[in-house]
């Protein structure tokens, strides 16, 4: 639930704020899988892995202040006050936050990965929400979900694996435009 108590999720607002502050990050998790075209249920949060250098964490802290981020807890729907700076952000491996724009999780070293630099190597930049968005490679998302082993992650694995196979096949066997045109004319 968001700070305002609504069920709204505004990924565009969160991403635009991160980008405006120059935060270096990679989107991970369900939203990243959806941006790759995986047909999984729509997510209500954003998970990111930020670069951990001090300057980037200071920019992230400024973005979190602008987003009015608070620590997410089941007992306090609007979240707990969250005083932070770059140094304090680096003291945890995960921050589960809530904002007026939706839930926002920071995972510095997602399961099955070595963190930002590891994910960045194969990340893709996609245009979404009117922004350029760095998104973890689908195979890295799969690797992380397998390592985490949570029931909700295991549930999505068959869909993610199928999507990964489809994307790999499209990269390895691109069809020529005239083949697509012929298929359309024939009703294929």
PLM regions with names:
Residues 1-188:
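Compositionally biased terminal segments of proteins
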């Amino acid at each position: 639930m968001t700070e305002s108590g609504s069920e709204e999720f505004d990924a565009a607002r969160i991403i635009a704020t991160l980008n405006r502050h120059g935060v270096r990050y990679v989107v991970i998790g369900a939203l990243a899988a959806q941006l790759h075209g995986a047909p999984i249920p729509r997510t209500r949060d954003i998970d990111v892995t930020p670069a951990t250098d001090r300057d980037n964490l200071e920019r992230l802290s400024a973005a979190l202040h602008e987003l009015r981020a608070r620590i997410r807890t089941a007992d306090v729907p609007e979240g707990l006050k969250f005083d932070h700076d770059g140094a304090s952000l680096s003291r945890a491996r995960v921050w589960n936050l809530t904002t007026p724009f939706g839930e926002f999780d920071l995972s510095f070293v997602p399961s099955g990965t070595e963190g930002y630099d590891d994910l960045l190597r194969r990340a893709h930049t996609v245009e979404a929400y009117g922004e350029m968005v760095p998104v973890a490679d689908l195979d890295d998302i799969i690797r992380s979900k397998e390592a985490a082993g949570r029931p909700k992650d295991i549930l999505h694995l068959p869909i993610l694996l199928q999507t990964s196979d489809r994307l790999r096949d499209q990269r390895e066997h691109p069809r020529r435009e005239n083949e697509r045109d012929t298929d359309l004319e024939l009703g294929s």
